[in-house]
Amino acid sequence: MNVTSKPGELVPESDVAAIMRGTHGDPFRVLGMHGGGGAPLSVRVFAPQAAEVAVLGQGGKVLASLERIGAEGFFAGTVPGEEKFPYRLRFVSGPHEWEADDPYRFPEVLGELDEYLLGEGRHYQLYTRLGAHPAEIEGVQGVSFAVWAPNARRVSVVGAFNAWDGRRHPMRKRIGVGVWELFVPGLHTGDLYKYEILGPSGERLPLKSDPLSFAQEAPPATASVVHGLPEAEWHDAGWMQERESRQRRDAPISIYEVHAGSWRQGLDYDALAEELSAYVREMGFTHVEFLPISEHPFTGSWGYQPIGLFAPTARFGPPEGFARLVDRLHRDGIGVILDWVPAHFPSDAHGLANFDGTHLYDHADPRQGFHRDWNTQIYNFGRQEVANFLQASALFWLDRYHVDALRVDAVASMLYLDYSRNAGEWVPNRHGGRENLEAIDFLRGVNERVRLDHPGCITIAEESTAFPQVSRPVEDGGLGFGFKWNMGWMHDTLGYFRRDPIHRKHHQNDLTFGMVYAYSEDFVLPLSHDEVVHGKGSLIGQMAGDRWQKFANLRAYFGFMWAHPGKKLLFMGGEFAQEREWNHDASLDWHLLDDPSHAGMKRLVADLNREYRKRPALHRMDCDPEGFEWIDAGDSENSVLSFLRKAPGEKPVLAVCNLTPVVRSDYRIGVPEGGEWREILNSDAAIYGGSDVGNPGGLQAEEVSWHGRPASLRLTLPPLATIFVTPA
């Protein structure tokens, strides 16, 4: 139709009706200022909250009063001038009057480079453009919103600022990349918002949280919170300079795994920064690994069903609080590892599921897209936008929060299409195989980007199968992880210590088999949260025997673990023999430290960490077969095993484990050199709650060949204990 000066003819009736119904997919074609270049200027506004609308020019001068078209609050009218110009709007409703800038007068938010990178699936700093960003455009303060929803008919940003009315702030669609964007003047940090989306058939979906929000309401509330890119005052330059050397294969890495909500209940991020950092420093751990911090709706998932992959959970305070926690740990010389969950996401209505009315982030076929074990959706790793979203999430935590490492959860479920599925319940890959080729490419891509963009940061795989080369470089055909959890070692050794000592002589292989494959990957030895939940009981509860034997067994186990090749990981509470199975709704039982047995266990773990860090023989060759040597793995009859840990130019450490409750006197063990040796750690020492049997004072190696070595020691082996001996 021809544009005239009559207000009712400034815009087609069908467009007016669609705007008022909230179904128009191209609001910038209708709303805002139109004309210029020889055509009359007009302004169209949808403001159902107003009775009158006027257009203001420079200095607040009223240029035109717009005419109301219909009963739903659509206003239009001509304004003087030949070319478009900045303007404001004045609204009147009864006794109330207010002014605001028109969102529909501002230019596009995304630039050409953004469109190109989004189209390529290589916008690795996606979080700098998508999400909600406080911004100033043309001198006006507000918030820029952008969200990917390519199949939506209409997307609006809603919040208290527009009475959660999806008709009032519909967004512009960037057709080429499927991103909807809008700059809303006058909004501020802290404002709540969601997206109202109409699906491909026009159906109104449940309100959605922003997939790239940097802050969320504390659950059970589900709104996103306007919050700029995390900005923190960092004081960790010293740590950042040393980080690469602190996380190499030859560095001592001893990880304390923590659930932030139950280490000590009631602590926010700042209180954790003070109390947790001091405790970890006291205990001598090199790193803290947090169970997922990403925002998650269900507390009982422990964070492993996240929705806010760019937002630290609000349960413990604002995002800045989490940054301060990381900063404090770094200042105390402690690295930070985050559990990161790219394998799957929950089906909560406000999350990623059915985001734009389609299976946008997952697969439509449940044989590919639904995980029955967890009732979650599986990401479509083959879709470049989804892979880009996840890669950007990984890089975000390293970039904006100075996180040092990501422990990638449930990698096995990503690698295999038939994971936890029977025949006929999965779809083979293009070669007819069971490997998820898209997930493999995705993991390699993430690990390469971490290596290239954040040198010194590492990734760690929780991977429970024999998939090859998980921790080998991508260029060598590997997946590119820095380390892999050794689930087989954990399963075998924990099973051994559950056995009555009388039967252990038949199961020595459970302790020795791990060395057959110990160097096939770069391993972390994990005694994680998974081993103290779901009816398994606590670590101390799983040990065989009466109370004395349980404590002795766990002390011996820890000694064996810290002497064994591989980096160390221990879940909170294990260090002082928490007796109750872990409960995410309750604090650890710190009162147990009033008991000498529990206090002794804690002291042992601290001393193990001290020895592990201090002695290169115990860590420098963790990932090199030259750093380990069996002395005697075959004395199964006595349930004794002995081995050396070595490093070039350093004193070796002899570890001897006696895993029955029998003292063995004058037990001869071959050693590589004569001279004086000394016992440097004994898990049966009285200070740890043991019976104090051992080898005080010096030990003189005799020139008696034994176990194929030129000299030997005669040792007293304490019951159910591990000892460390080294040349004096």
UniProtKB/Swiss-Prot annotation:
One of its GO terms (biological process) is glycogen biosynthetic process. Pathway: Glycan biosynthesis; glycogen biosynthesis. The active site is at 409 (nucleophile), 462 (proton donor). Gene3D superfamilies: Glycosidases, Golgi alpha-mannosidase II, Immunoglobulins. It comes from the Bacteria. The keyword Transmembrane helix does not apply. Pfam families: Alpha-amylase, Alpha-amylase_C, CBM_48, GlgB_N. Signal peptide: none annotated. Catalyzes the formation of the alpha-1,6-glucosidic linkages in glycogen by scission of a 1,4-alpha-linked oligosaccharide from growing alpha-1,4-glucan chains and the subsequent attachment of the oligosaccharide to the alpha-1,6 position. This is 1,4-alpha-glucan branching enzyme GlgB.
